[in-house]
């Protein structure tokens, strides 16, 4: 957006550098707005103190996850465990676990923190794994993104890491030189999809999603948790992991 604005208006200097700098500043501004929204939310000072701690931890974890994601791409290597760590920090914690803990704090229900963590962490990871599958095998007419977008972007996902581990030498070489190539054709993407399927990686990831979802739902059996809340959270878990978009 900012880079395009620079080019369209013939601004001085480098358009790409302007775009990157402007995007970073916009991200900084969004963090300021998030703080302001919390301060102006109407919660009490005591509630604010408790929530602010969770809020800061959530942002720390998110930034760490984003950095690890960038680092994986720069290293150009694949590791299932490292990719899973990225999934946990980049998505699992901030998208599900921390918001639940945030709500528990506001409701004075910190006694449920362990239950919410036991539910949120595996579900958050499963949510990211489903996103990874859709990023390679998703239907463009449903997702709104070209098939194989994650391959073109060179994302070192758990799915890609598992494929690298279990495919043969030729498949590994093709994956290695193809990941991050923005010019991959539909035919190229189809060839990479076949490698991922034949290596067993897709089946393994689907199995892992099921295991993580089952683990998350089992945490909802806590007798301290209201049955209606447990039902809503279970439905959310199914929607989050069985989605097609």
Where are the regions that the model predicts?
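All-alpha prenyltransferase/terpene-synthase fold signal
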Residues: 1-245
